[in-house]
A protein has these predicted regions:
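Periplasmic-binding protein-like
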Residues: 146, 169, 232-240, 278-302
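A ligand-binding cleft/hinge motif common to bilobed small-molecule-binding domains
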Residues: 123-126, 264-281
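Bacterial signal peptide processing site
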Residues: 22-24
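Mature extracytoplasmic/periplasmic domains
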Residues: 301-379
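Extracytoplasmic ligand-binding site segments that recognize negatively charged/polar headgroups
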Residues: 47, 51-70, 112-261
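C-terminal motif of bacterial Sec signal peptides marking the signal peptidase cleavage site
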Residues: 17-20
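Conserved C-terminal helix/tail region of periplasmic/extracytoplasmic solute-binding proteins
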Residues: 370-459
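Early extracytoplasmic/lumenal segment of secretory-pathway proteins
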Residues: 27-126
Length: 459
């Protein structure tokens, strides 16, 4: 009997002890903001891993002696911030994702935790609404003043509490000016993507959000509608387009447009500049009906183990040196005024071979065409919405409907005359390697030019 009493006493003591531990150990997600979270009790000399999750090829990575942002952050932290955190050392663990959705899946399944992520606007909106992001005082970042006021107070983060802008860009149409009739592009319309004259030479996005958007901008439909009928109308347009397509593509577009095996495609302006640097016959315009305008921004997920260190990383990323290196490497426009006004950056951008109809250079293509100007007509169709051309997150029901429509489009009986499944798989494997090599090499070359100029300047 005594043994049972002692056993029961020990059991209850253990339960109470565990309960006490659980109650005392709060997770970062239990706090309203990063600033409310107590600093962990790091040990002096301890190496702490900061886990960063970003898009592929979306940071200056030190290849061939270029500016390595992650290594430079480690160096900066260990020299200047270590004592602030008890004498620890930082090691950046960097991993990449191909889509917002895959990143979201990784975060929600809880298998891996990350400290910094860089999702797109609509995904930030979704994750914030689901409690997957930590709030933090962006104004306390010493470099936050570098971010242009135009990129603060956005629809997805109106109070600037969950994100810091990293890069932005707009969608448009790329065409071969040597082989596409000037009269067919004079109107600057999405209709070019449906022009039967170029049957077999048109490329469409191989993802539902962007592909449907091309049809929706063309027809003046809301890209953020929850109405199934709106999406059915867009589907009809894509069904009309399908017989004249060469195929649905992702990164294969680089090789196809550069070697002139395709003549017309829709893609993002930063990537167009990469292609134009390799093929002088390529030109670009923003369709008059409206285009997608995206912002990718740095956030701290609620699963972060080191939210305070994540803030230090984000602050470093918007410093002039890191932001310029990243902007040159990525090729998209920067929301960072320290980049836009940087002389070396401007000079490097002018080295792109692109020249527009009226002598417009690469820098002007990125920065002189503001989203409000490009989307003036589309915005007028939805006067009660803020930035209606930007993608919003959908309800689960709407997303399921879109996915089903996309599957029906891809599986429809209409034959894609220029793409065959077996040969396509073989070609895709080869193209993936070629595209990766070309794309990476071109982006890095501009980073090297900036690096060399900076070395000469300080020599």
């Amino acid at each position: 009997m005594l043994k049972k009493i002692i056993s029961l006493f020990l059991f209850l003591s253990l339960v109470l002890s565990l309960a006490s531990c659980v109650g005392a150990s709060k997770k970062p997600s239990d706090y309203e903001s990063v600033e409310d979270i107590p600093l962990p009790e790091y040990k002096k000399g301890q190496t702490v891993s900061l886990k960063v999750y970003n898009w592929g090829e979306y940071i200056s990575d030190g290849s061939e002696d270029s500016f390595d942002v992650n290594k430079e952050f480690e160096k900066y932290f260990n020299e200047h911030l270590s004592e602030k955190y008890g004498g620890i050392k930082i090691k950046v663990e960097y991993s990449m994702y191909p889509t917002n959705e895959e990143m979201y899946s990784k975060i929600t399944n809880g298998a891996v935790s990350y400290d910094v992520i860089i999702p797109s606007d609509y995904m930030i909106q979704k994750m914030q609404s689901e409690g997957l992001l930590l709030s933090f005082d962006t104004g306390s970042l010493s470099n936050y003043g570098n971010i242009s006021e135009d990129f603060k107070g956005t629809y997805y983060d109106p109070d600037n509490r969950y994100s810091v802008p990293y890069t932005y860009g707009m969608l448009g149409i790329i065409y071969n000016k040597d082989k596409v009739d000037p009269e067919d592009v004079a109107d600057k319309s999405w209709a070019l993507m449906w022009n039967e004259k170029y049957s077999g030479n048109i490329l469409q996005f191989n993802n539902p959000r962007d592909a449907f958007a091309t049809a929706m901008y063309k027809e003046g439909l809301s890209v953020n509608s929850d109405d199934p009928e709106v999406w059915n109308k867009a589907l009809l347009e894509l069904q009309k387009q399908k017989p004249i397509l060469q195929g649905y593509v992702n990164d294969e577009i680089f090789n196809k447009m550069e070697n002139e095996s395709a003549l017309i495609a829709s893609y993002y302006v930063g990537d167009f500049l990469t292609m134009a640097d390799n093929q002088e016959n390529l030109a670009f315009y923003y369709p008059k009906e409206g285009v997608n305008y995206f912002i990718d921004a740095m956030c701290i997920p609620s699963c972060s183990s080191n939210p305070h260190l994540a803030k230090e990383y984000i602050n470093f990323m918007i410093s002039e040196e890191a932001a310029v290196a990243n902007a040159l490497y990525i090729g998209y426009a920067s929301p960072n005024t320290a980049v836009v006004e940087n002389e070396e950056y401007i000079e490097a951008m002018l080295e792109y071979s692109y020249e527009g109809e009226n002598g417009e250079n690469a820098y002007e293509l990125l920065y002189n065409n503001t989203p409000d100007t490009v989307n003036a007509y589309y915005n007028s169709l939805f006067p009660d919405e803020i930035d209606p051309a930007c993608y919003r997150s959908f309800s689960d029901e709407t997303q399921k409907n879109i996915n089903a429509l996309w599957e029906s489009l891809k599986k429809s009986s209409t034959t894609e005359p220029w793409i065959h499944v077996v040969s396509g798989l073989i070609v895709a494997s080869v193209l993936t390697l070629e595209v990766y090599s070309t794309y990476t090499k071109k982006k890095r070359s501009h980073s090297y030019r900036l690096r060399d100029k900076q070395k000469k300047k300080t020599a």
